[in-house]
Regions:
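Conserved acidic
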Residues: 1-172
């Protein structure tokens, strides 16, 4: 997603890197400048968040609220009351992001097979593409470090307590 946001020409000097000519270590190093934001660059998440929010300026209020309040970088998590409401919101958001920012809202996951059936296979998360939504049980999905059992619609928390001896210092 970061690659969708261009770096302004006056800032490209700050995003330089060296690479061997023709990818051959025996040849000279060439200096390149990034034209787009890349994964691993510190400001990229903030740029992506800003870009997403800018894309929905002027959109319907529900789309703006979804993107501005329910996204963390490029993951949107929301709970809605009905299948129709979920499908309508996601489709409207897909359309706005595509038109306003040439961004693709995909990797869709839901605890409702009906919601996922409303979208093309390429819009679904990779784990969901191979499922037969009429027959298969929905798997456990992990997003933002949180495990979600789609079948029972519950979150799963895995907590690992370190093995440390009981001492006064530890408790005081």
């Amino acid at each position: 997603m970061f690659y969708s946001f261009l770096v302004s020409p006056e800032h490209r000097d700050y995003l330089r890197f060296l690479w061997y000519q023709d990818n051959d270590p025996n040849k000279e190093l060439i200096e390149y400048r990034m034209k787009a934001h890349v994964f691993g660059n510190s400001p990229s998440p903030a740029v992506a968040t800003y870009g997403l929010r800018k894309c929905v300026d002027g959109a319907d209020e529900d789309v703006q609220k979804y993107v501005c309040e329910n996204f963390y970088v490029d993951d949107g998590l929301i709970s809605l009351d009905s299948t129709k409401e979920a499908v309508d919101l996601l489709k409207k958001t897909q359309e706005v992001l595509r038109k306003q920012g040439n961004l693709r809202l995909h990797k869709i996951v839901s605890n409702s097979p009906d919601v996922m059936a409303a979208f093309k296979k390429e819009d679904l998360d990779k784990e969901m593409k191979s499922l037969d939504l009429d027959k298969d049980n929905l798997p456990v999905h992990t997003s933002l470090g949180l495990s979600w059992d789609l079948s029972s619609d519950v979150f799963i928390f895995n907590i690992n307590f370190p093995e440390k001896p009981d001492t006064r210092r530890r408790y005081l």
